């Protein structure tokens, strides 16, 4: 994602299962959607050991999104979005935003929540909901790398 303050917009490219939420007035007003070939199978651009490409079909989503003052942009890896429901992210952003905390504090708190949830075995998470939809019995979080960036426009 690239934020252009002169044009009041954000340009995004999305492939795979990382994601972006645009939160305005305590609501998600825009978001990316995971690009997957099936459950737990995100689209990837990669090379084999011999240098030949695997699935290089250009299927990325390209978007240009208008921004307003006070918008909160949350960019996260699947470690965030597999372990924390969107409503929880919005709630945390609202609580932290109302408390005048920095973007870094917001990102740190979201990473901490995702990490705690990833270790739980008795929790309903976005990951466990998707697993069930795919016909798999799974409960709890999904241990994974967790990366979060937050920008207040």
Which ranges hold each PLM region?
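"…together with the soluble PPM/PP2C metallo-phosphatase catalytic core" -> "…together
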Residues: 1-69, 144-150
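C-terminal catalytic subdomain
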Residues: 54-76, 80-153
